[in-house]
Amino acid sequence: MKPIADPRLNLLTVLNVQSARPTGSTGKRPAVSHAPTRDWHAIARKAQKKVKGASAGAERARRALADKVDEAAEVIEEQEDAQTDDAKVEAEDAAFSDADSDDEVTPSSSSSVAKDPFAAHFGPDTALVEGKENAQLEEEEKKWSKGKSVLPGAGEVVWMRPEGVESAVKGEEEALKAYNPKLVEKLRTSSGRTSVPPTQAAWLRTLSTCQDVLFPKVEVGSDEHDAIREACAMHAMNHVLKTRSRILKNNEFLARSALDPSSSSTPRNTQDQSFTRPKVLLLTPFRNSALSWVQHLVSYLPPTTSLIESYPRFVSEYSLPEGASDKLVERADEYPRDHVETFKGNIDDTFRCGIKVTRKAAKMFSEFYQADVIMASPLGLRTSIEKDGDSDFLSSIEILIVDQMDVMLMQNWEHVQFVMERLNRMPEEDHGCDFSRVKPWYLDGKAAHLRQSILLSSLDSPELRALFTRSCHNRSGKLRAIPRAPNNGEGVLGMVPRGLRQVWSRFEGGEVWEEDEKRFEFFTTKTLPTLLKSAVSSSQTLIFVPSYFDFVRLKRYLQKNLSQLGSDFSFAAISEYSDTPEISRARGAFFQGKKKFLLVTERFHFFRRYRLRGARTFVFYAPPIHPLYYPEVLAFPFTAPSSLPSFQPTGDADVDESELSAHVLFSKYDVLRVERIVGTKDARRMCGLDAEGESVYVHRELEKSSRVASDLDLEQWDG
């Protein structure tokens, strides 16, 4: 943007910007007001009346302000002289801002708006929600069109969109026009590249449509994961810079109009703001992934940015302490790759950080109401909201990015739901908002229907799909990628030690809300009695429980019925909440035979990845969420020890595969988990619509060891 020549205009622009900023202190936020919801439309109309018209009071105020401008003119001129050396920076900034000229919304620029997805989707008069009440939008969503297609970089997807909304993914060249050319050039030339990488280009084609995206098949730590992060970071920064550019242009327009109303013959819509400043919310599970995201974000700051305030502090606080070594990385060959990639570096899960972006600087650790981007963990954000009783800073989020949602499933999913429920709510306070410049759809409470949500995970789950359905209502449409089972759809049975007998028992789950009770009933009345009747499975049995709530229920049941289960029955239990001494005692007692059964949660395996020895029978209360955990657990007797008690030998002696067995409980509602383990074809047969009642599927060893996973037989006996 070119600097305003008249110093009075310069000061007026500054004053206009200041008036649009929240005026709250940087201290503790006030408690949430329980007063009736304000009529924001009435407030906005009143503010607009003050702007329009040339009343005598307004004229006197303008003259008084002009006197103050004259007094400050000399000071401003001195400051402008000191900025002579910044001519090159100013020129770059002008070029950077001019690249966003399509953002301007005037009656004569409708064709430009149509070409710019940002203006068409987030503009003040967007046709996506104009003229429709919230109830109508919600009712229409139930009737959205649905279909399947194949997208570059995403593979097969399910798309959902309102009738009449065109959300087709455009070609690369056309899609990149939606982004600032300076950012595209950075993407093209960073790391010595000469063109936009294919993965980033494919993702930008999708993101530029402003649709919601659920992508449940990105492998943590992979090159693809990093490329997706880079594309999303550029997309988010482009949104922040376009928003800022429009506001600055309108500030200049209003400043000129205030001094000389006749200078603006062309009408201009200056409704460019929202209730609060933050526009991008980025949720990650640990500080290590937050650090990676911020490194991508700052790489796409404007070329005029000469300072990133508190960035060294951010890097220090989100990395390991100085001088500390990462023992997990040093012993990477002892752990699966996904475990190392997830837990290397700083894995604190309670953090939040505001990032403010201005023309010449960026600031880390900005107060939320002054930030453009909020980076946080679900737990960290929830802690802040509950402490201050304030979530208004989430009222104007326009881009939501949630990374590693599979990890959040292993933390506390309720924290994610807590944050999602508070997005785009009508604020309790005005926070210094200039209502004359607030976009109408904010005042109408329709922001949730325009927010773009980008959800990334390494696997699919009912929880993710439910969140995508209930919390994402983007009127530009929604895309959900369809993941394939591992090994090209064949699952992971080929990784299980050969000769190990596997029994998959399907129970009738009833309705969704009945499934937990049905599973518990099936286990306690059929599975457990069968185990106790056998001389083999009545001891050295490991029970793997994916859900912590099911784990607690089983543990209480076994404790309560200890005497009824047999005089020699005993068990130990370890979960993600067990401390190291408790874990060591339980592992030692189970291995030495002092405890017949060992209960373990999937979260314990996720966080610790210990190899538990002594088991000959493996019972899965439900299929594990992570498919690789199935062959990992069944390989415990054959793998080298890790973090073992000092008394334990290096392996289970004289292990014969024929002595081992696995029992898996599942229902039709476990189809996503079953598919990842046994493969798509067998999962459809085991969990399909015609798979009703109780059935048992037994995997029997094949004679030819060279046969591949797709040839593994699952024979059915109807129960």
Model regions: which residues?
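Conserved Walker A/P-loop ATP-binding site and its immediately adjacent core
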Residues: 225-233, 253-263, 269, 273-340, ...
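SF2 helicase catalytic motif II
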Residues: 371-383, 388-434, 616-625
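A short beta-strand element within the Helicase C-terminal
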Residues: 398, 599, 610-622, 661-663
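Conserved interdomain hinge at the start of the Helicase C-terminal
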Residues: 231, 235-244, 248, 265-272, ...
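Acidic, serine/threonine-rich intrinsically disordered low-complexity regions
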Residues: 1-22, 28-161
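A conserved SF2-helicase RecA2
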Residues: 460-477, 613, 625-719
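Conserved two-lobed SF2 helicase motor
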Residues: 353-357, 368-385, 590-607
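Conserved helicase ATPase core of P-loop NTP-dependent helicases/translocases
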Residues: 364-366, 542, 552-559, 565-607
